[in-house]
Regions:
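Hydrophobic helical membrane-anchoring modules
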Residues: 1, 164-279
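Short loop->beta transition adjacent to catalytic acidic/histidine clusters or analogous donor-positioning motifs
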Residues: 2-5, 25-34, 42
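Short hydrophobic beta-strand elements that form part
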Residues: 6-10, 56
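Short, well-formed alpha-helical segments that are part of the catalytic scaffolds
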Residues: 12-27
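Acidic helix N-cap motif at the loop->helix transition within catalytic regions
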Residues: 16-20, 41-49
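A conserved acidic beta->alpha catalytic loop
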Residues: 36-44, 89
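Acceptor/aglycone-binding surface of glycosyltransferases and processive sugar-polymer synthases
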Residues: 59-73, 93-167, 194-203
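Short beta-strand-to-loop acidic/aromatic patch adjacent to the donor-nucleotide binding site
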Residues: 79-90
Length: 279
């Protein structure tokens, strides 16, 4: 399948990591596209020297434009599938082949970073579970990780007409695939976090998720949460028996928390229940 899969990578001021990532993808060089998204450091020069194909934007357009640019390039060059991964070192390129294999059976593959919770900060576990369960409420899909940017997908009409801005496109893409009846799976990938670090969630990311969710479900609770966020207040939400608390921080971020024992049980089901063992 390799010859039909475009590997597209967004890069914004990644001079510290981009050469390492591209070197690890040398075996797939002719299938790789780098989208230099308005970098102001030496990222573009390093990509040029590497000899990889790239497109440069004069300003930083963000993730929605990245997907649009990548899809247009893929269609123009007759690719049937696409894999995306970040250029900041958080996604291990050695897993690209795992995504390619899974794409032979699924329409969308999302990377799952939550196989070893001992190396993931509790706040990150809570915020990811919040997004996963909200996605379940919308479409009934049960996945361990719904926000990972390391993903593979079949290029289809599902992608048409994106109007979602900022991080919301990551969720909208998933919801569109599920709504269309596509087969969605996941690939386990390593998480690169330090468990003692505190990972707060940016307000823009939360608002993006909630705004996309509102397009698929009529639930007044989401409106109430958005009002609290606008007022920079803490909020709580209960989803499928899991209680979430989000504390507003002065840095315009929220710190999520939940019952870690229950959260661990949620993620363990993907290890023990054959229904979820998609690898």
């Amino acid at each position: 399948m390799k010859q039909n899969v475009l590997i597209s990578i967004p890069a914004f001021n990644e001079e510290k990591h981009i050469s390492i990532i591209l070197n690890q993808l040398s075996a797939f060089k002719k299938y790789v596209l780098v989208v230099n998204d308005g970098s102001t450091d030496n990222t573009e020069q390093l990509i040029r020297v590497s000899g990889f194909t790239y497109i440069s934007n004069s300003i930083n357009w963000g993730i929605t434009e990245f997907y649009k640019t990548s899809l247009e390039y893929a269609i123009k060059n007759n690719y049937t599938h696409m894999i995306t991964l970040d250029s900041d070192g958080q996604h291990d390129p050695s897993y690209v082949e795992d995504f390619m294999k899974k794409l032979e059976h699924f329409d969308l593959i999302v990377g799952n970073r939550f196989t070893d919770l001992s190396i993931i900060p509790e706040s990150k576990i809570a915020s990811n579970l919040f997004a996963a369960l909200l996605s379940r409420k919308i479409h009934g899909i049960i996945l361990p990780d719904v926000a990972c940017g390391f993903r593979g997908m079949k290029i289809s009409s599902v992608f048409g007409g994106y109007r979602i801005e900022a991080f919301g496109v990551v969720y909208d893409m998933l919801f569109r695939f599920v709504k269309s009846g596509s087969q969605v799976g996941y690939v386990n990938i390593p998480a690169i976090y330090h468990p003692s670090d505190v990972y707060a969630t940016k307000i823009d990311e939360i608002v993006s998720l909630l705004n996309v969710a509102r397009q698929y479900i009529d639930w007044s609770v989401l409106e109430k949460i958005l009002v609290k966020i606008i007022k920079r207040k803490d909020f709580k939400l209960r989803l499928f028996g899991y209680d979430f608390r989000a504390q507003y921080l002065d840095s315009k971020e929220y710190l999520f928390s939940t019952d870690l024992i229950k959260a661990t049980a949620y993620y363990d089901q993907f290890k023990t229940n054959p229904q979820f063992q998609l690898l």
